């Protein structure tokens, strides 16, 4: 027994048995996690079983597995696929006649990181849709362009919805006191033709005033872009970060008119950074908005325009494989906020 446990899990027999007790020592957990990070499938299976627990340890382990799956935490090159398969096996067990009503398996019957990873792994479209329904419920598009159909949940070319983008960016804003991030909006109201960015700026100024770094996520109809108002040398500047083709002149003019409300009177104080970054990140405008906020929150006193211009230039130097990996991992990291 000792030899078997040690060869499979690199744990002593007492350490292995302790995994099924109420308290698991930090040392035992660290040993198991180390093996998981190295891609030990037996340990991955074991850790996924621990993640089923509905206590603090279960939630901690589930989060760690998702961090490895989403690339937030580094592991072996194929770690996400191994975690995927382990979660899929658990999902299949959770839905057999014996266990389907067992509360110990509830994380695989309700929105959770484990269920999301299982859905990512299955190639059965009907199962994928069934799992997506459990995760998303009945969602409705806020604009005609939003793709909220459950069959697209794991699609690598799916446009992010307002709610997904809001959940993720508000989560980032809570982690960074340097940024104020507003709920995503459309630029122009579809029926009244009202400039919604202007309205949101007026409301923000009336309620609390603009912060030193005020972020607005704006949808121009079928595309997300980031609009940042910030102070540089005591002067208010406006920065538009657009990761697709150049905006048309009407759209630019609507943004310029809105910027006047923030106190910007000269066009030289409005900077449009426009670079197509989506060749290998299809419909990735929302992903870049999210990542941009991450960059800005870590930029300190650096000029935001310089930070984002350098990011765009550097991103285009990445290989196709690296850009594709960015697409996959960022989508997973963003959706995690909707699972909390």
Swiss-Prot record:
GO biological process per UniProt: proteolysis
An example Gene Ontology CC term for this record: host cell cytoplasm
Active-site residues, record numbering mapped to chain: 223, 285
Keywords: Host cytoplasm, Hydrolase, Protease, Secreted, Thiol protease, Virulence
Enzyme Commission code: 3.4.22.-
Domain of life: Bacteria
Top class in the EC scheme: hydrolase
Entry GO MF terms: cysteine-type peptidase activity
Subcellular location: Secreted; Host cytoplasm
InterPro entries membership: ElaD/SseL-like_N (IPR054329), SseL-like_C (IPR054328)
NCBIfam families: PRK11836.1, PRK14848.1
Function: Effector proteins function to alter host cell physiology and promote bacterial survival in host tissues. This protease targets the host cell ubiquitin pathway by acting as a deubiquitinase in infected host cells.
Entry's family note: Belongs to the peptidase C79 family.
Protein's UniProt name: Deubiquitinase SseL
Gene name per UniProt: sseL
